[in-house]
Amino acid sequence: MNGVAVSIIFQRFFLKGQKGLTPDGTLNTILTTLGLDPILWFDVDRPFLANCCLVFISIWKYIGFDIIMYIGAIQSISPDLYEAADLDGANPWQNFRYIVFPSIKPIISLQLILAVKGAISVFEIPYITTKGMMGTTTFVIKTINTAFSLKKVGLASAMGIVLLIITIIVTFIQKYLSLIHISEPTRLQL
């Protein structure tokens, strides 16, 4: 789903109005109906709460893709492996530990790489939801502001290159660590 659409939907869920400063969004309406006080979700004094809301939005946005990847990986496991494990007397935990988990390790590695890359270069959700205010500024938002608000295009380009280098280094480290773990043999011990 488009990150802009998701951000606008959740902005209305947490806050109402264009400025985002009034705590009368859908969630606070529910809290008030339950007899609780409304909460200012995106507040300058509580950047932790604002960042938790952004994490929740990001998880909601990407969880469908992640689940589809894992379901596809699990369904690609040969039924013969499960049959052999049943004949050997494996319980469900052993099936998971020795058949499912080793079979989906490459997908877990890919998902971790995509998650870290996305976390490093996150832009649309915090920018649309909070405009990068209230302690939610990311490196990419800072880069965009440097380029367009401060008119320092050269500095913004250098910041983009630094982000690219950091992303490549982190990806190589993750790939190296995942190759070490994937190459380790696992034996079924009953």
What role is predicted for each listed range?
Residues 1-179, 183, 187:
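A structural signal for multi-pass alpha-helical bundles of membrane permease subunits
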